[in-house]
Amino acid sequence: MAAARPTVSIYNKDGSVSSETLALPFVFKAPIRPDLVRSVHTAVAKNKRQPYAVSEKAGHQTSAESWGTGRALARIPRVGGGGTHRSGQAAFGNMCRSGRMFAPTKTWRKWHVKVNQNEKRYAIASAVAASGVPSLLLARGHRIEEIPEVPLVVDDAVQSFQKTKEAVALLKEIKAYRDVIKVANSRKLRAGKGKLRNRRHVQRRGPLVVFNEDTGIVKAFRNIPGVEIVNVRRLNLLQLAPGGHLGRFVIWTKSAFGLLDSVFGSTTEVAQLKKNYFLPENIISNADVTRLINSDEIQSIVKAAGPSRVKRAHVQKKNPLKNKAVLSRLNPYAKAYKANVKINSEKTPKAAGEKFLSVLHEN
């Protein structure tokens, strides 16, 4: 279970605690599935890609013809003419300098990936539930050591902010501005060719502000480093779990937080804003399997652990015809048989003449 607190406090824009409280929405008790979130994020992130391809003319913008056989050279097309290093050089092939690539990329590649609707909803519910676990937020790198509580809910007056300085003042009052400072300090030059493609800098992610109605809040928060803003009806896995990693620091407005039960419903009540959707339910109520196994009720009926048997990693195959120990293990009578043969062979043999006479007598 992700969160267990029954109520959540509401904080005013000056950082003081309001007398009002809200019940914790059912979505914060949804199962947290990192494997599902990672796979859905990988698929959904592919739908934002821009098609790319090399030019159809690349590598073929020259005149070249094969010289044929008889010159002890490869039959690859070669540039004609003379008076330059280019003449006589191979062209067109993917193994050639200035040639085309093998299998030139096309824009009609299959770029998009279809994801099941219920799977996407499950992943978003898991990401929302994970945003209510302080340990996951800290593990993701958010600086939330000084904030009053998680989930963090602020009054609806924040939705009417018009100026960025008002938004910055709010973040400082609720002790969330440390996360913004972390983002600003993390801004660095991107490694690779992205620097030349309008992606010159990279930086970490900061808080995600979720609102219900935009009466100026988007413009107030949009220019703060690392801060993203989204409507509660348009929650996105790419923002709730950037990189497929659970634990995004989310700041909710009061009305947006109260609308979560209508957006996601519960395990027994259908969601009002989704058709025939129920929240996923845990298969087991207590996820601490170790505690269950070690409980007195289960240990009282479980057999005691016997001596450990370690299977040999590699068993050498031995020839029983050459190895006496293996032969005696396979055929216990072999040892006695060899002993009898040895005893019989030790008996005094007949003289050569007697043996010859006995053979003649038989004939």
From Swiss-Prot:
GO terms for biological process: cytoplasmic translation. The keyword DNA repair does not apply. Keywords: Cytoplasm, Ribonucleoprotein, Ribosomal protein. The keyword Ribosomal protein applies. Pfam families: Ribos_L4_asso_C, Ribosomal_L4. Transmembrane segments: none annotated. GO terms for molecular function: RNA binding; structural constituent of ribosome. Gene3D superfamilies: 3.40.1370.10. GO terms for cellular component: cytosol; cytosolic large ribosomal subunit; preribosome. It is found in: Cytoplasm. PROSITE patterns: RIBOSOMAL_L1E (PS00939). It comes from the Eukaryota. Component of the large ribosomal subunit (LSU). Mature yeast ribosomes consist of a small (40S) and a large (60S) subunit. The 40S small subunit contains 1 molecule of ribosomal RNA (18S rRNA) and at least 33 different proteins. The large 60S subunit contains 3 rRNA molecules (25S, 5.8S and 5S rRNA) and at least 46 different proteins. uL4 is associated with the polypeptide exit tunnel. uL4 interacts with its chaperone ACL4 and the nuclear import receptor KAP104. Component of the ribosome, a large ribonucleoprotein complex responsible for the synthesis of proteins in the cell. The small ribosomal subunit (SSU) binds messenger RNAs (mRNAs) and translates the encoded message by selecting cognate aminoacyl-transfer RNA (tRNA) molecules. The large subunit (LSU) contains the ribosomal catalytic site termed the peptidyl transferase center (PTC), which catalyzes the formation of peptide bonds, thereby polymerizing the amino acids delivered by tRNAs into a polypeptide chain. PANTHER family: 60S RIBOSOMAL PROTEIN L4. The eukaryote-specific C-terminal extension harbors a nuclear import signal and delivers the ACL4-uL4/RPL4 complex to the pre-ribosome, triggering uL4 release from ACL4 and incorporation into the 60S ribosomal subunit. There are 2 genes for uL4 in S.pombe. Belongs to the universal ribosomal protein uL4 family. This is Large ribosomal subunit protein uL4B. The lineage of its organism: Eukaryota, Fungi, Dikarya, Ascomycota, Taphrinomycotina.
